[in-house]
């Protein structure tokens, strides 16, 4: 995400969590949790006085998230699909999904599941890349996005994840 957003995703995530307006003694499910950035920002905001469940299909991402969150007792990690969460009905005050909704197999199932696990009056927030509407910026974006896989090859020695990222954004819209 640093490469794709030129690091701006950090500001987006911080703004996202601020907009969520987390309160202490609540419960968050962070779906497509990845490296745990949203969970960490949430817990920092409530001084670790809440509970968080990080959900991701990728076990390696969850391992990274555990390290980032220092394996806190009030944070739990689940390797699961967004379409079938291992939680009771009405369990969470907040449901977040960032940079993950475009990767699910069925958005309607994910949304249905999110509302199932949210308490009445709970908050659902989704953060995702989008298409650029400004024509001038869109031209810059198209040039930049075509160069991202090559930059990925240079920096991490791999183009596939970056090609997937660009393609998944294009296909989502």
Where are these regions (language model features)?
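A short acidic, Gly/Pro-enriched loop at the edge of an enzyme's catalytic core
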Residues: 83-95
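C-terminal alpha-helical "lid/dimerization" subdomain adjacent to the S-adenosyl-L-methionine
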Residues: 131-173
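A short SAM/SAH-binding and catalytic strip from SAM-dependent methyltransferases
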Residues: 93-106
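Class I SAM-dependent methyltransferase SAM/SAH-binding core
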Residues: 27-84
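Conserved alpha-helix/loop element of class I SAM-dependent methyltransferases that forms part
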Residues: 6-24, 41
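Short beta->alpha hinge that forms the Motif I/post-I loop of the SAM-binding pocket
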Residues: 56-57, 106, 129
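A short glycine-rich, Lys/Arg-flanked "PGG" loop and its adjoining helix->strand segment in the class I
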Residues: 108-123
């Amino acid at each position: 995400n640093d490469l794709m957003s030129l690091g701006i995703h950090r500001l987006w995530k911080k703004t996202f969590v601020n907009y969520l307006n987390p309160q202490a003694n609540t419960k968050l499910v962070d779906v497509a949790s990845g490296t745990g950035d949203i969970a960490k920002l949430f817990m920092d905001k409530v001084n670790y006085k809440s509970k968080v469940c990080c959900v991701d299909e990728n076990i390696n991402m969850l391992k990274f998230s555990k390290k980032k969150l220092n394996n806190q007792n009030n944070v739990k990690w689940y390797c699961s699909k967004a379409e079938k969460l291992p939680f009771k009905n009405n369990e969470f005050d907040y449901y977040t999904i960032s940079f993950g909704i475009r990767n699910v197999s069925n958005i309607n199932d994910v949304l249905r599941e999110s509302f199932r696990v949210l308490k009445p009056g709970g908050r659902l927030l989704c953060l995702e890349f989008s298409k650029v509407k400004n024509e001038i910026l869109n031209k810059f974006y198209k040039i930049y996005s075509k160069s991202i896989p090559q930059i990925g090859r240079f920096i991490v020695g791999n183009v596939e994840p970056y090609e997937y990222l660009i393609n998944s954004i294009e296909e989502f819209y």
